[in-house]
UniProtKB/Swiss-Prot annotation:
Catalysis performed (reactions): L-citrulline + L-aspartate + ATP = 2-(N(omega)-L-arginino)succinate + AMP + diphosphate + H(+)
Gene name, Swiss-Prot/TrEMBL: argG
Chain residues that bind ATP: A8, Y9, S10, G11, G12, L13, D14, T15, S16, G117
Assembly behavior: Homotetramer.
Upper taxonomic lineage: Bacteria, Bacillati, Actinomycetota, Actinomycetes, Mycobacteriales
Name of the protein: Argininosuccinate synthase
Length: 400
């Protein structure tokens, strides 16, 4: 088996240190794989050069923005995926895509080992390693941060001692993960639950308490559950996310301060920014309310929750998730139409819906003249619907 190590490289502290550490401590060559998921910030050529400067024998940059949007974010939209009803899976969605490209790189560069920079406390170690086990069980996995108990202080010290070009200090110890779907910030003073986030924590969104901005009204169009237009203009899924990130972010939409239950059994505090994601999920959910039959909608809400839990728990490649997506695909056949939303002050307000597939019948719903609902049928329906409750109540109350 080859001694080459294929490393998931972010350009950040832990993976930059990992390149140098693997070379120095094990003598193995490192191929760094950096994936553009629309995270912005540094130019990917700069990230690639940093990997080489840290000691990688090769550094590969992959533009996966459209793939991420179409194959990972879109299923999350269609499953209205919010872990614990709040978190739109910002990091969790990206991990299986990274796994896929690392496995491909291992085959191409004849590497027998794949590596990541995850700690032993987080969910990402599970997402990576279960993914590797699902796609390439023959590959060995190296996790230096976890297996050698690196702390951020130790990593910073190693970076300083070895002149690793990374801009992190003990005074600004935030751990940040971001992509086009959103941004996650943790560690530092945020680990104390009573501490309020400071302005420097945020980047994708403006302060929602500043009400100087004019409300932004946006119309999002869907075709079979796929976002296809904004204000009547055709867009790809990636373009929809990017535009709504800008517009909703300018209105302070998408800030989330969450204490979540990690897969490893601990609770953690995370600050998320996901303006585009929250708008798209809100709009899609609302369109489903209009177009899905009641029992289908009720059941889908249970599968939506399960889908999100599976992705959060690192089971992207599981048979159950695959089966759930077949069900979700069937539910989307009539999820077409437009949702109008107002973005302002950190809030999303739906104020309009229209669809050729709508199950809303005005003549049945109206209380005004033109009502076609046969109210005479209601009395019998109510009696039959409550019959079992009535029978049990008579027994329990001793009424014959």
């Amino acid at each position: 088996m080859s001694e080459r190590v294929i490393l998931a490289y972010s350009g950040g502290l832990d993976t930059s240190v990992a390149i140098s550490w693997i070379g120095k401590e094990t003598g193995r060559e490192v191929v760094a794989v950096a994936i553009d998921l629309g995270q912005g910030g540094e130019d990917m050529d700069v990230v690639r050069q940093r990997a080489l400067d840290c000691g990688a024998v090769e550094a590969v940059v992959i533009d996966a923005r459209d793939e991420f949007a179409e194959d990972y974010c879109l299923p999350a939209i269609q499953s209205n995926a919010l872990y614990m009803d709040r978190y739109p899976l910002v990091s969790a969605l990206s991990r299986p895509l990274i796994v896929k490209h690392l496995v491909d790189a291992a085959r191409e560069h004849k590497g027998g080992i794949v590596a990541h920079g995850c700690t032993g406390k987080g969910n990402d170690q599970v997402r990576f390693e279960v993914g590797f086990a699902s796609l390439a069980p023959d590959l060995e996995v190296l996790a230096p941060v976890r297996d050698y108990a690196w702390t951020r202080e130790k990593a910073i010290a190693f970076a300083e001692e070895n002149a690793i070009p990374i801009n992190v200090t003990k005074r600004s110890p935030f751990s940040i993960d971001q992509n086009v779907w959103g941004r996650a910030v943790e560690t530092g003073f945020l680990e104390h639950l009573w501490n309020a986030p400071t302005k420097d924590v945020y980047d994708y969104t403006e302060d929602p308490t500043l009400n100087w901005s004019t409300p932004d009204e946006v119309i999002v169009g869907f075709d079979k559950g796929v976002p296809v237009s904004i204000d009547g203009r055709d867009v790809t899924v990636l373009q929809a996310i990017e535009e709504l990130n800008r517009r909703a972010g300018a209105q302070g939409v998408g800030r989330l301060d969450v204490v979540e239950d990690r897969l490893v059994g601990i609770k953690s505090r995370e600050i998320y920014e996901a303006p585009g994601a929250m708008v798209l999920i809100t709009a899609h959910t609302e369109l489903e309310h209009v177009t899905l039959e009641r029992e289908l909608g009720r059941f889908k809400r249970t599968t939506d929750q399960k889908w999100g839990e599976l992705v959060y728990d690192g089971l992207w490649f599981s048979p159950l998730k695959t089966a759930l997506e077949s069900f979700v695909a069937k539910t989307q056949e009539h999820v077409s139409g437009e949702i109008r939303l107002v973005l302002h002050g950190g809030h999303i307000a739906v104020n309009g819906r229209r669809s050729q597939e709508s199950l809303y019948d005005f003549n049945l719903a109206t209380y005004d003249e033109g009502d076609t609902f046969d109210q005479s049928s209601a009395k019998g329906f109510v009696h039959v619907h409550g019959l079992s409750s009535s029978i049990s109540a008579r027994r329990d109350l001793g009424i014959k």
